[in-house]
Structures are given as structure tokens and as C-alpha cells.
Amino acid sequence: MTAPSQVLKIRRPDDWHVHLRDGDMLKTVVPYTSEIYGRAIVMPNLASPITTVDAAIAYRQRILDAVPAGHDFTPLMTCYLTDSLDADELERGFHEGVFTAAKLYPANATTNSSHGVTSVDAIMPVLERMEKLGMPLLVHGEVTHADVDIFDREARFIDTVMEPLRQRLTALKVVFEHITTKDAAQYVRDGSYNLAATITPQHLMFNRNDMLVGGIRPHLYCLPILKRNIHQQALRDLVASGFTRAFLGTDSAPHSRHRKETRCGCAGCFNAPSALGSYAAVFEEMNALAHFEAFCSLNGPQFYGLPVNTGWVELVRDEQQIPENIALADDSLVPFLAGETVRWSVKK
């Protein structure tokens, strides 16, 4: 029997879905991403969403100002789609290299999404322009109708929004972000070359029992919400198969402790400190480490038409405890897997 490897060396990965927030929170969380990843697709759902080229340029500079010396990191900016967004502004940002992609949030689907899209028809001229440009559309794939159960929102979105949209704009490049169901896994697997998906570490590692049985664990609460075990297993099977249109997107989403541990807590897991090691543990459990580098470092650039990073990252089999909390200016931040021991850690 071959002894398990003690070191995993992969091309420097990218994070194709991250929330860096703003202000003091941004300054705290950016180094956890910039230390490990060469690039990251930065979500635009700030309190004042990023809807213009100038706003994206200013936000990008605030991010770069928070990157520590010695970190080689490029934030890839996204435009927040609204019913009133100007297609010319979006095209200008894409041509000028400011916007890498645009993000569709259904109105009120998640944090800071009240400005989101009320219907696909409302933004059809913008989507048609994106199709012509070859600009990727990033989709939070949940319906928000009051009569749809929260555990059914993703599956319903496929039938009522995603599939009709892709039938209408067959050349539109779409990333179905943070997929959580067997329905989405099968839909992406059966889809064409221009449909891809990101998957978070928490949706590969946990299901809704982990969040709800024996007490509520607010730091596992995110949107889309954790689903049944059968859905978790479908995601694991998808990445273990070496499917090339699925790639790393942590959806790392920090909230201060008092906003998570309260009677109406916020959705989001701050997983940036432990995500890469968490993914490695999942791939190892599935005897799929042969596909780990592609998921982290190759599939995303291939879909986006970007070069692979030139640097390398090493993960070592060296147990490391995740801190219980991370200090903020006037609160603290509880990271994903706080207080737990992880098997794989990034070599500093």
C-alpha cells in the first residue's frame, strides 16, 4: 500500500467567487485571499453596489491598497446588474479591462441584493450585449418568490429562469455560482461548453444536518442554504469525476460575529483562511487528488479565457488549528471551521 503524499504542489489557484466587503472589514480579510490566490472574482454587492466603471476602479484600488507587500494578487471586478443598468457603461468597462464579468442577483436573494434584478426581461438588452461581447454572466441561481421553499429555490430557478434564458441566448457564457443541488450538478454536467459552475468548500463538506442537528450552527449558515446529503453527494461526485466546467469559488463572505450570532443572523461563511486545505481534504476523501489542481487552478482560467498562473502553491499534510476568532476594529470575525483542526495547510 502506498503511503499518502505529504505535499501537494499545484499551480497557484484562483478564487472565482469572493466577497471582500469594504472599509475595515476589507482591510482585515483581503490578505487571507491575496496570500494564496493569484486572482479572485470580486463580488459587487456592497451597500452601494458596483454599477459603474468609476465605482469599480475605485473599489479595485481600495482592494489593492489592502494587499500586503509581497503578495502578487489581481482582483477581477464585476458589475452588479440592475433593472436600469446602461449597457453602454457595461461594454465600456469590459473593453477597458475593468469589468471581467457581470453579476445577476435576483432581488433580495442574499446580502445586499435589494437592488438586484426583478426579472430577466428587464435586463434583456444588457444580456444580449453581453452575449455579443463574450462577457460572462455570473448567476446567483435562486428564485425569491414567497411561495417557494428555501430548499427548493435553486431547482425552481433552473426551470423557470436559467433554462429559458439559455434557450433565448444560446451563446451567452454563464457561470452558475455556488451550486448546491443534484439538480444543478446534473444541469451543468449536461450543459454546453459555455455553462460552468463554482462550488464552495462548505457545500462539499456539509449538509443541512450539520447545520441544524444538535443545535443551530450559525457559522454554517449561507445562501444558497446547505441542502440534504443527496445533494452534497452529487456535488462531491461532480468534482471527483474531473468534470472540467466546475471550479473553485469559495463564496467567502465575512460578517462580524454580532451579525452572525443574533436572533436574525446574516448568511455567509468566512472560509478564506481554510478553503484551499478544505478542498484538498474533500478531494483526498474521494480519492480524487488527481483532479485537485484542475479544479483549483486550471478549469477556471480555461473557461474565462485567461492564462494559468505561473507560480505554484504547496499544501502540506500538517495539522493546523483554525483560530476561534479574528479581531476586527470593534468586533471579531469567526472563520469557517473555527477551533477545528484541518489536515492540509498552505506552506508559508
Curated annotation (Swiss-Prot):
One of the record's GO molecular function terms: zinc ion binding
Cofactor notes: Binds 2 Zn(2+) ions per subunit.
Required cofactor(s): Zn(2+)
Keyword Ribosomal protein applies: no
Catalytic residues, chain numbering: 251
Pathway(s) annotated for this protein in UniProt: Pyrimidine metabolism; UMP biosynthesis via de novo pathway; (S)-dihydroorotate from bicarbonate: step 3/3
EC number: 3.5.2.3
Keyword annotations of the record: Hydrolase, Metal-binding, Pyrimidine biosynthesis, Zinc
GO cellular component labels: cytosol
Residues reported in the UniProt entry to bind Zn(2+) 1: 17, 19, 103, 251
SUPFAM superfamilies: Metallo-dependent hydrolases (SSF51556)
Catalytic activity: (S)-dihydroorotate + H2O = N-carbamoyl-L-aspartate + H(+)
Residues that hold Zn(2+) 2 according to the record: 103, 140, 178
Binding site for substrate: 19-21, 45, 140, 223, 255, 267
Presence of keyword Repeat: no
Leading EC class: hydrolase
Modified residues (N6-carboxylysine): 103
One GO biological process term: 'de novo' pyrimidine nucleobase biosynthetic process
Protein's job: Catalyzes the reversible cyclization of carbamoyl aspartate to dihydroorotate.
Quaternary organization: Homodimer.
Entry similarity comment: Belongs to the metallo-dependent hydrolases superfamily. DHOase family. Class II DHOase subfamily.
Protein name, per record: Dihydroorotase
Species annotation: Salmonella typhi
